[in-house]
Amino acid sequence: MADQEMQKLIKRINELAKKAKEEGLSDLEIIERKDLRQKYLKKFRESFRSQVEMMQIFDKEGKEVTPEKVKEVQRKKGLRDD
């Protein structure tokens, strides 16, 4: 569902970008564009943060080298038992 919402945001942002280049935007459209961009960035950051929090990193020898800060977040969310 979040993916569909992101696609809708991107589509509308692109429509407004095209219109801005071709003929310019009204004041309401400028406000809408700013709002859509903020919503997009918020959702992107949430998604990226979630991906990083779920990540475990291993070196070539198979030893986990996940940064301690990420491990702490994972522990707080109950994603780790160590």
From Swiss-Prot:
Pfam families: DUF896. GO terms for cellular component: cytoplasm. Disulfide bonds: none annotated. It comes from the Bacteria. It is found in: Cytoplasm. The keyword Nucleotidyltransferase does not apply. InterPro entries: DUF896. The keyword Cytoplasm applies. Keywords: Cytoplasm. Transmembrane segments: none annotated. Belongs to the UPF0291 family. This is UPF0291 protein PEPE_0871. It comes from Pediococcus pentosaceus (strain ATCC 25745 / CCUG 21536 / LMG 10740 / 183-1w).
